[in-house]
Amino acid sequence: MYERILVPVEHTPYDDVILAHVRKLASTCNNASIVLIHVADGWAARNINALNLRESEEMKSDREYIEAIADSLEKDGFEAEAILAGGDPAKEIAACAVRENCDLIAMTTHGHHGISDVIRGSVASELRHITMVPVLMVRASPRTTPASPTVPS
């Protein structure tokens, strides 16, 4: 069914929700490979290449986080890779899905975050309008976060 699943992670407890679903899904799809992406969208991340900047401490932490998740997935028998991108999250996720030949994007949604989502919309909402890759959205809230985290804190 699916061969390569792109999983955007946010470096929050919500990630455990989608990762639990993706583990099950990848297992039923002949161990589909999993591509993790975190899109840093701070000023440094958006301008790192244009201004030849070094990774910020936040970006280093994000890289360590997604690499730890990839290592955990690999220990469980999945083929996994981690990508740290910078820029507009929806656009970077959509571009990564095409570049990495992913046939599914699986991500969490967690409802509106106040006025900012009303004004600019959520990443999930924007992504579904700009990608041709199917998107699986799983609603997550602190109540649905699994008891045992995927990556030790």
Where are these regions (language model features)?
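Phosphate- and divalent-cation-binding pockets in alpha/beta enzyme and binding domains
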Residues: 17, 92, 114
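Gly/Ser-rich helix-loop-strand patches that form or flank binding pockets
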Residues: 4, 96-153
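Short, solvent-exposed amphipathic alpha-helices that sit
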Residues: 21, 58-69, 92
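Acidic, proline/glycine-rich short linear motifs
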Residues: 37-64, 143-153
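General small-molecule cofactor/ligand-binding pocket signal
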Residues: 35-37, 81-85, 136
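Small/aliphatic-rich secondary-structure junction motif
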Residues: 1-49, 153
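Structural beta-alpha unit
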Residues: 1, 24, 71-105, 142-153
